[in-house]
């Protein structure tokens, strides 16, 4: 008769596979009833400090990491790195950044304004367009080609220059009379003398100035 072999216990087989797959953490021990205990050694007192019992190995490992950072600070050896430790990790020398990331960053950055270098040949002239001037409320006066006086506007400023006036003789006589009467009225002491008389004074003044301004002035006699 062939001997029948004993079948392996399934509970023992599952426990063996679980022990093989289970990750061991620093400062964590598994209890026989399935829970996990965490403890750490105090470097100052040289004693072991009990941290507690947890349901999972990860919880016990995190409790150990917290206690290790309290005792040893940045030199502590932990099971899980913190977010700051992950961000401080440098990229290995053999690996380079992909060109797609660099191109994305370049496109996201704002364009740089390129200012051309100014030379003496292509510099445009500076135009003053402000109405108030350089400052202080002052204004600039535009220079004229030739000063214009009041007598030039009235048509009698070009007599001594040998040039005919731009106005007609009919309009010239009352203008001369008005200017003369206004000047005489300004020198008078009474207020009534400043009134210009256009009726009687015009004939008297035209008789006194019986000159044709369209002709050149007479030559001086020695």
From Swiss-Prot:
GO terms for molecular function: DNA-binding transcription factor activity; transcription cis-regulatory region binding. Residues 24-81 bind DNA. GO terms for biological process: cellular response to hypoxia; ethylene-activated signaling pathway; induced systemic resistance, jasmonic acid mediated signaling pathway; negative regulation of DNA-templated transcription; negative regulation of ethylene-activated signaling pathway; response to abscisic acid; response to ethylene. Coiled coil: none annotated. Its main location: nucleus. It is found in: Nucleus. It holds the Pfam family AP2. Residues 1-22 are annotated as: Disordered. CDD domains: AP2. Induction: Induced by jasmonate (JA) and by Alternaria brassicicola (locally and systemically), but only slightly by ethylene. Strong induction by wounding, cold or drought stress does not require EIN2, whereas induction by NaCl does. Transcripts accumulate in cycloheximide-treated plants, a protein synthesis inhibitor. Seems to not be influenced by exogenous abscisic acid (ABA), and heat stress. SMART domains: AP2. A motif (EAR-like (transcriptional repression)) lies at residues 211-217. It comes from the Eukaryota. The keyword Signal does not apply. GO terms for cellular component: nuclear body; nucleus. Keywords: DNA-binding, Ethylene signaling pathway, Nucleus, Plant defense, Repressor, Transcription, Transcription regulation. Interacts with SAP18. Acts as a transcriptional repressor. Binds to the GCC-box pathogenesis-related promoter element. Involved in the regulation of gene expression by stress factors and by components of stress signal transduction pathways, and could also regulate other AtERFs. Contains a slightly degenerated ERF-associated amphiphilic repression (EAR) motif, which may be involved in the activity of transcriptional repression. Belongs to the AP2/ERF transcription factor family. ERF subfamily. This is Ethylene-responsive transcription factor 4. It comes from Arabidopsis thaliana.
């Amino acid at each position: 008769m062939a001997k029948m072999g004993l079948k392996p216990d399934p509970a023992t087989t599952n426990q063996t596979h679980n022990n093989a797959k289970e990750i061991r953490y620093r400062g964590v021990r598994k209890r026989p009833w399935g829970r996990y205990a965490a403890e750490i050694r105090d470097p100052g007192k040289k004693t072991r400090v009990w941290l507690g019992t947890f349901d999972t190995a990860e919880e016990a490992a995190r409790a150990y990491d917290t206690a290790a950072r309290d005792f040893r600070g940045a030199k502590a050896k932990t099971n899980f790195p913190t977010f700051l430790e992950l961000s401080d990790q440098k990229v290995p020398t053999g690996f380079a950044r992909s060109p797609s990331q660099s191109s994305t960053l370049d496109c996201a950055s704002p364009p740089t304004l390129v200012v051309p270098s100014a030379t003496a040949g292509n510099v445009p002239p500076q135009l003053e367009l402000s109405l108030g001037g350089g400052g202080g409320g002052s204004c600039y006066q535009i220079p004229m080609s030739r000063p214009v006086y009041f007598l030039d506007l009235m048509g009698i400023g070009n007599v001594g220059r040998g040039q005919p006036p731009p106005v007609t003789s009919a309009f010239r006589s009352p203008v001369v009379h008005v200017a003369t009467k206004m000047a005489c009225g300004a020198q008078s002491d009474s207020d009534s003398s400043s009134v210009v008389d256009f009726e009687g004074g015009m004939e008297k003044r035209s008789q006194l100035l019986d000159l044709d301004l369209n002709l050149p002035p007479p030559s001086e006699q020695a």
